[in-house]
Swiss-Prot record:
InterPro entries: PSI_PsaI, PSI_PsaI_sf. It comes from Chlorella vulgaris. The gene is psaI. May help in the organization of the PsaL subunit. Belongs to the PsaI family. This is Photosystem I reaction center subunit VIII. It is a single-pass membrane protein. Keywords: Chloroplast, Membrane, Photosynthesis, Photosystem I, Plastid, Thylakoid, Transmembrane, Transmembrane helix. SUPFAM superfamilies: Subunit VIII of photosystem I reaction centre, PsaI (SSF81540).
Length: 36
């Protein structure tokens, strides 16, 4: 059961969460550079 459900949850999670974290970190980095 778990072996078939896990990929269908993990793939969208990685596909959505990882880019969101990357965008957020880049946004914060740019904001930090502009303030200084």
């Amino acid at each position: 059961m778990s072996a078939q459900i896990l990929p269908s949850i993990l793939v969208p999670l990685v596909g959505l969460v990882f880019p969101a974290i990357a965008m957020a970190s880049m946004f914060l980095y740019i904001e930090k550079e502009e303030i200084n």
